[in-house]
Amino acid sequence: MACENMFHRDPHNGHIIDSVCADPEEFNEYIDMVNSEYLVACLDLGHCGVTNRDAAYCIRKMGGERIKALHVHDNDFVNDCHTMPMMGEMDWDSITKALADINYSGNFTLESDGFFRGMGKDENILLQALKLKEAVSRKLMRDIMNNKSR
């Protein structure tokens, strides 16, 4: 079972505000308090961005002993766009370095459904988009591995 860092919007002004486990220290407290082999952290990297947190800092603060799953996507730090990595404002060089530093070996879920919005249903275009997502994922994985060997 994985718990995820979350946010919500203030109902009065629409601003993004913290929700459960948005803060990495709080997230650590919850995981450590339950102290169960069945509860792990799923760090949503895009949620780090929209809550004005540095994803690399969150990764290092939580460590590989807690983080066993990632939701990997990019955004503009204003909206939870769920677009493909390297198409927004996230710093993927520092993220892949941090993942290497904690020797990350968990799940890597590319959660970039927003990348497909507006593409229509043309199978050739969708196939090319999927191939691009695969190439970006492979690049991120290579970057993590290359940083581990340094």
Language model features: what each stretch is:
Residues N5-D18:
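Active-site-proximal beta-alpha loop/turn segments in soluble metabolic enzymes
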Residues H12-N13, C21-R150:
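Histidine-acidic metal/acid-base catalytic patches
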